[in-house]
C-alpha cells in the first residue's frame, strides 16, 4: 500500500518540479491540470507570480521592474507538457499495476512559500461526456475559477 502512495506522490511531485524549473523557482504558487480519459492524456499549467495569475505563456506579464524575464519559448512549454503527460501515463500504469482507479482529472496546487500541496481528483469522465468542451476548455475554466476565488 505504502509503495503505491509513495510512487503516486513522487510522480505528482515531478509534475510540480518541472513547472518550477520552467519559472526558475520564481513563483508563489504552481497549478497543474492533468486529464486522462480513455486513450487521451492532456495537461496544462499556470502560476501565481507577484500576486498575478498567469498562464505559462504569459509569465513575463507578471514580472516587476528589474525582474529577469523567463524563457517562454514554445519548445520549453512543450517540454513541460510532455513531462506532465508522461507522468500522467506513469500514474495510469501505476494505478493499473496496483488495481486502483485512475483519476480522470487531477488538479494540483503547490504553494511555494508554505510548502503546502493540495490535490483534487475526479474519477468520472469529464470532457469525454461533453459534446462541446475539450480538456483544454476545462483547464481554462479552472484557471478562471482560481483567479476568481483567489486561491
Regions found by a protein language model. Give the residues of each.
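Short, surface-exposed linear segments at secondary-structure transitions and domain or protein termini
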Residues: 53-58, 66-70, 128-133
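A broadly used, surface-exposed interaction patch
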Residues: 58-85
Amino acid at each position: 500500500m505504502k509503495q503505491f502512495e509513495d510512487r503516486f506522490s513522487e510522480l505528482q511531485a515531478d509534475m510540480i518540479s518541472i513547472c518550477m524549473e520552467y519559472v526558475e523557482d520564481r513563483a508563489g504558487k504552481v497549478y497543474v491540470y492533468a486529464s486522462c480519459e480513455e486513450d487521451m492524456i492532456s495537461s496544462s499549467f499556470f502560476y501565481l507570480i507577484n500576486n498575478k495569475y498567469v498562464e505559462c505563456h504569459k509569465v513575463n506579464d507578471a514580472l516587476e521592474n528589474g525582474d529577469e524575464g523567463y524563457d517562454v519559448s514554445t519548445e520549453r512549454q512543450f517540454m513541460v507538457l510532455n513531462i506532465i503527460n508522461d507522468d500522467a501515463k506513469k500514474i495510469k500504469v501505476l494505478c493499473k499495476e496496483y488495481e486502483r482507479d485512475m483519476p480522470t482529472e487531477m488538479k494540483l496546487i503547490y504553494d511555494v512559500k508554505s510548502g503546502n500541496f493540495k490535490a483534487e481528483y475526479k474519477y468520472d469522465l469529464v470532457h469525454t461526456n461533453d459534446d462541446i468542451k475539450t480538456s483544454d476548455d476545462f483547464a481554462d475554466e479552472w484557471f478562471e475559477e482560481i483567479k476568481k476565488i483567489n486561491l
